[in-house]
Amino acid sequence: MSNFHARREFLRFLAASPLLTQAWGQDAPGVIASAKDAINVMDFEPLARKALPPAHWGYMATGVDDDVTLRMNRQAFEHYQLRARRLVDVSKADLRTEVFGTTWDMPIYVSAVGSQKVFHRDGELATARAAKAKKAVQMLSTATSVPVEEVAKTLGTPPWYQLYMPLTWDETEKLVKRVEAAGCPVLAWTIDLLAGRNTETATRFTRLDNRDCLSCHMHSPKAGANPADNAGKPMLAGLAGTINPPQATWAYVDRLKKMTKMKLVLKGIDTGEDAKLAREQGADGVIVSNHGGRATETGRGTIDVLPEVIDAVGPQFPVFVDGGFRRGSDVYKALAIGAKGVGIGRPYIYGLSSFGQEGVERVLEILRAELSLTMRQCGTPTVASITRASVLKNGARL
């Protein structure tokens, strides 16, 4: 056997090794036969792992460097405990909350994940149909495999739009105007990948694949653009296709804000200092995010960053969070700390990979049910009644 083939076989063994499960997911007692069989959202993970080719699994499931931040996104939830109050009328739970003047049916949204056709043939449209059915807000990636206009039509309302900024302002304006023309109410500029990233574990998984990926990435950032000429085409049609300007500074926030009537949210905030700067520069909100442990190896879970950020900007400034959320009780902890909404990524992609729209719907059902139960168990039957009095960090009040 040649050295190349020996390395290839070793990587195949590595991909299947249960030793890696702790970093990239969690064990389940068995592979479920249908979406309705899922008891918690991670029941979809083993089936998704079997369904996806190595490169696609590696793209979704792994982190950067040694996957420390990826693991901490989960482990950090153990730092927080709940304070349950008793003898409150908990016969019903009301999960509704108001965000930017719009009432959400629940404080859980579908985070942006690119190129969803690599996970299921219907891609973002299956996710949109599920989000519509379960009354969840969807955030669409710049790297979408389906144009924003088509997603908006399927969803029944325009999604939030996650922006990977093109390198020039002319191209940025073309893309932003197209998204605005599609009716998107919120622009979430991702700022945590401007220096690139070291996805070495995912790279090892790609070595297991010999396929040409153009068939499933054809609408990704290779080809957004102006509404008149490019509606319905790939989001970066007519543009150079290069994104994430490394020279971007805080001055970009004001310029981007003046370019659109959409609300501007900065995604990828990891410190209180930057959250405060975002507010001062005119952003309408921030998303505490480390790209699911796939950007910078900070070693900090987003739930641990959240108190610092909210303390820096105050409770009136909208702060959202994503990264590692797998339980309704996880969502509850973020709401208690002060988050306005919580984004989920990998769980719904595992559902999508396993059962398409039905899988995404079931993930949203489970998280909603778990959050509702936690709210009632803790004596806080409305979102507004969830406060820092409901949570401890390492046994102490926040």
Each model region followed by its residue ranges:
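N-terminal secretory signal peptides and thylakoid transit peptides that target proteins
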Residues: M1-P18
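An N-cap/entry alpha-helix motif that binds or orients negatively charged groups
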Residues: P29-G101, L208-A248, A384-I386, L392-L398
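Conserved, mostly hydrophobic/aromatic
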Residues: P53, V110, A131, W189, ...
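Glycine-rich active-site/cofactor-binding loop and its immediate structural neighborhood
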Residues: W104-A143
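Acidic (Asp/Glu)-rich catalytic clusters
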Residues: V148-G156, R279
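Alpha/beta enzyme core
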Residues: K174-V321, I337-A339, I344
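Short beta-alpha connecting loops at secondary-structure transitions
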Residues: N290, R294, Y348-V360
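C-terminal helical cap(s) of enzyme catalytic domains, especially alpha/beta-barrels
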Residues: T302-E308, S353-L371
